[in-house]
C-alpha cells in the first residue's frame, strides 16, 4: 500500500497541474490562498470557532491555524507562511513536521501583519482566495483578482474528482466516524439522553463539538422528524421509540458524513420500515455507475419510497408510478438523495456541469437535491434516503383529491418515531462503486 506521503506528493502534483492551467487561462502569475482569520464576536473579546478555507486545506492539512498563507504558482514548491506568534495568552501551534512538510517551503509568520513584507512587491497579477476580502485589498490585490469567479469555478469543478491521497484521508475519516456511531448506539441502548449520546460520540471519535465537520444530529423519537435537529435534550424521553444519528468526522480536513436510524423495539412496524428502507438503499446503490446523472438516482429513490409506502399500507389505492408523478412521495422524502462530499460536507460543484461553472439546477419538483452532476470516476457522494413523518409537510395532503389515499391512522401512529435516514459514503470507480461506510461493517 502506498504511504500517505507518496499519495500526498501525487496529490500535490495534480494540484500544481490545475494551478498552472487556471493561472494561464486567467493571465495570473500566482494564487495567494489564505487559511482565514478569527472573527470577533460583537462587542466581545472572544472569537467564533475558527473554520479554515477549504481551498487552503486542499493543499496542506492545516485545519486549525488562522493567518496562514499559501503562495502557489504551479511550478515552484508552494510557499507556506505558518502563523506562529509569541503568545503567552493562547496555545500556539508549533511549526509542523509531518509527511507533507518537505513538499512545501515552510516559513514561520510571527505577526499576522508581517505577510505584507513577505510577499513579492508586484501583486497586480496575483489572485486571492479566501474570505478576508478587505485584507486582500490592503495587500494590494486588485479587486477583480479577489476570489475571481473563473478561477474558483475551475478549481471547484476539478475538486469533485478526488486524488488517491484524498480518498485515503476520507477512508480514515470513515473509520473514526464509525467508531463514534457504534459508541452512540451503545449509549442509546443504555437509555442515555441526546446530550449524553453526543458526548459518547465525541469521546469515541476524539473530536470536540467544534471539530466535527457539521453539528451532530442526535435525535430521539419525534425529534427525528426535524431534518437538522441539533437541540440535544439533557433528559431522555420516558420511552425510547427511535434514534436517528447523523454525525461525521474529519481526517486531514476531509469529511465523513454518516447516518443510521434504530428502533427502540425490534419487532415494531417502525423497525420493519427501517429494515426495508435499508434494503432499498442497498438495492439502489447496486445500480449506481459512472456515466449516469445523479438526478436519475434521486428519482429512482422516490420510486422505491413509493414501493415502501404501498407495501407498508401507508398510501393505498394508487399506483406507485402515480404516487411519484403526483408528488405523494415528497412529504415522506423531502430532501435530496445526497450530495458531493470531500473537504466540505456539502462539497463544491454539485450543480456545475463544466469548468466554466455552467449551472444545472435541481428539478423544480425536487428543489432540495444538492447534486445534478454526471457521475465520474473519482467522485465521492452520499447516498442518504429517508422516510419521515413531518406534520407541516403532511398537512397540505390531509385535504384535496389525494387525501383518501393516505392511511392517516397508520401514518399518525408513526409520527412519534419521527423518521428514518440511512446514509453511506460512496466512491465512483470506473467499473464499480466503493461503499466506504459498509466496508467497515456499519450495519
From Swiss-Prot:
The protein's matches in InterPro entries, at most eight in alphabetical order, are given as:
Creatin/AminoP/Spt16_N, Creatinase/aminopeptidase-like, PepQ_N, Pept_M24, Peptidase_M24B_aminopep-P_CS, X-Pro_dipept-like, X_Pro_dipept
Q: Which UniProt keywords apply?
A: Dipeptidase, Hydrolase, Manganese, Metal-binding, Metalloprotease, Protease
Q: Which GO terms describe its molecular function?
A: aminopeptidase activity; metal ion binding; metalloexopeptidase activity; phosphoric triester hydrolase activity; proline dipeptidase activity
Cytoplasm among keywords: no
Its EC number(s) = 3.4.13.9
Catalytic class of the enzyme: hydrolase
Q: Which residues bind Mn(2+) 2?
A: 246, 257, 423
Q: Write out the residues that bind Mn(2+) 1.
A: 257, 339, 384, 423
Catalytic activity annotation: Xaa-L-Pro dipeptide + H2O = an L-alpha-amino acid + L-proline
Q: Which GO terms describe its cellular component?
A: cytosol
**Any one of the GO BP annotations:** proteolysis
Q: One Pfam match, by short name?
A: Peptidase_M24
Answer whether the UniProt record assigns the keyword rRNA-binding to this protein: no
Q: What does this protein do?
A: Splits dipeptides with a prolyl residue in the C-terminal position.
Q: Can you tell me which family this protein belongs to?
A: Belongs to the peptidase M24B family. Bacterial-type prolidase subfamily.
Q: What is this protein called?
A: Xaa-Pro dipeptidase
Organism field: Serratia proteamaculans (strain 568)
Upper lineage is:
Bacteria, Pseudomonadati, Pseudomonadota, Gammaproteobacteria, Enterobacterales
